[in-house]
Amino acid sequence: MTPEAFAADVPVSRETVERLEAYLAVLEKWQRRINLVGKTTLDDPWRRHFLDSAQLLALLPTPTRVLLDLGSGAGFPGLVLAILGVPEVHLVEADGRKSAFLIEAARITNTRIVLHTLRLEALPVFPVDVVTARAFAPLARILEGAAPFLLAGAQGVFLKGQSVDDELTEAQSQWTMSVERFASRSDPTGHILRIGEIHRA
């Protein structure tokens, strides 16, 4: 996927594409030093990372003012959603090197974020509208970690892969919840789960 195809698909302005191009440049630079993403995914970053993240925008609750992204790593999807206009994005990343990358990527793209360099269980609870995660943990572990936010009324929007059915079965043995499932636009084997109304089973 080219930047032009991405811009037509999402769609976004030329200025936003330029910010994402700057993001990609700093990602490729840092990737030589620390493992931020799977190496082969950089063969098609506009599909594998930027579209993968941007497709969540249409699935966020309306309005979404505060977003909490778990295990942000290289910034997908949280930093992309901040670039695309979510007003207040909190990134949680325990790894200090990855946190340093996120600070630099936010600086280069002129994007306001709130970074929490700590483990999720150490994060104080505050009001959020939606919790996101990609490649962070199995669904049951995500729900357990994010429970203080989800039980307070936040929705969850999570990118998942081929193991989605097994992960849902495990999670639903511990939680009752509403689940909506969407096919990924960036990965034929991927899925997006939108979860709400969560209670312990």
Curated annotation (Swiss-Prot):
Domain of life where this protein originates: Bacteria
Disulfide cysteine pairs (residue numbers): none
Q: Return the EC number.
A: 2.1.1.170
| Locations listed in the record | Cytoplasm
Query: What catalytic activity is recorded?
Result: guanosine(527) in 16S rRNA + S-adenosyl-L-methionine = N(7)-methylguanosine(527) in 16S rRNA + S-adenosyl-L-homocysteine
Instruction: Kindly list the GO molecular function terms attached to this UniProt entry.
Output: rRNA (guanine-N7-)-methyltransferase activity
The entry's cellular-component GO terms read: cytosol
UniProt keywords (A-Z) are: Cytoplasm, Methyltransferase, rRNA processing, S-adenosyl-L-methionine, Transferase
Gene3D superfamilies assigned to the protein according to its UniProt record, in alphabetical order: Vaccinia Virus protein VP39
Name of the top EC class for this enzyme: transferase
Role noted for this protein: Specifically methylates the N7 position of guanine in position 527 of 16S rRNA.
Give the family, as the similarity comment puts it. Belongs to the methyltransferase superfamily. RNA methyltransferase RsmG family.
Quote the protein name from its UniProt record: Ribosomal RNA small subunit methyltransferase G
Species this chain originates from = Rhodospirillum rubrum (strain ATCC 11170 / ATH 1.1.1 / DSM 467 / LMG 4362 / NCIMB 8255 / S1)
Q: What is the lineage of its organism?
A: Bacteria, Pseudomonadati, Pseudomonadota, Alphaproteobacteria, Rhodospirillales
